[in-house]
Amino acid sequence: MAKTPGPISLIEPLSGNSALLVKINAVYVVKRSRYQEIVVADTEDFGRALILDDYIQSSYYDEVYYHESLVHPAMSTHPSPADVLILGGGEGATLREVLKHRTVKRAVMVDIDGDVVEVARRYLPQMHQGAFDDPRAQVVIEDGFVYVERALAAGDKFDVVIMDLTDPYSSDIAKQLYAPGFFKKVRGLLREDGLVVTQAGNSFFFPEAYDMVLHGVRSSFPTVAEYSVWIPSFGYAVNYILGSLKYNPTALTPEEVDRRLRERGVQTHFYSGRTHLGLMSLPIHRKIRRV
């Protein structure tokens, strides 16, 4: 595997006024796809990382915090998730976590950028861990908006929809998938007891974008839970918003979460019943402005 030696530095934007300086020791690939610049590099503090348009999307040393927190609260809240739709998640780690649940019969991953998927297959094996080749997995290279409309027209149904997209403010690719009207479409794809979960960027640096996503979920789902997890390679806490048509994720006890994980054969590094309780109990972060 060819690589360009470092060290060099990545200036990763946190907001329009702040940034994270990341030391890069080696670069494996730099590629411009139709939609974005794709970089895979070895970083000093975070290990190998997938970087899209100067934003770290996933890194070996901390991606489990992001992906386990995105996937398992919703999957554990549903008593028997069989059909799961993933929008985004090109590196395959979200798919990997979904497929840990023995209840899953079908996991459809839809990503607009096939180049990201191919780069991940070759350069990020620890991310996907063979998930792309699982017989339950179906990888579709298509705009998520188009796929959802097509699935709606076909009458397809899912138990859980997981939105692992780029931030609503970092690029134009995914913006329409965060709009209130899109969450209404997602609701139409779900069975009567279905759930959706989306990452929603950061509520501290980008409160307006976060509130837009929150409004979209609340407009279509009767039960909504907000939670966040600190991701070191991002330099901030990532926010998640979970919408449910029937089950309340905040009502699950740690014992019930652990029982469901155990019965489904799910092994995790970070997420557990105790973690679930913590995620659902702590407030999100916003700027506290004092005069």
From Swiss-Prot:
One annotated Gene Ontology cellular component of this protein: cytoplasm
Domain PABS: 5-245
Name of this protein: Polyamine aminopropyltransferase
UniProt entry keywords in alphabetical sequence: Cytoplasm, Polyamine biosynthesis, Spermidine biosynthesis, Transferase
Gene Ontology biological-process annotations: spermidine biosynthetic process
Assembly and binders: Homodimer or homotetramer.
Enzyme class per UniProt: transferase
Keyword set includes Transcription: no
Organism, as annotated: Pyrobaculum neutrophilum (strain DSM 2338 / JCM 9278 / NBRC 100436 / V24Sta)
